[in-house]
């Protein structure tokens, strides 16, 4: 899933 810029 896409978490954003947190990786």
Swiss-Prot record:
As for what it does, the entry says: Myotropic peptide. Stimulates the contractions of the oviduct.
Q: Which GO terms describe its biological process?
A: neuropeptide signaling pathway
The molecule here is called Myotropic neuropeptide 1
Residues with the modification Alanine amide, per the entry, are: 7
Keywords attached to this Swiss-Prot or TrEMBL record, sorted alphabetically, are:
Amidation, Neuropeptide
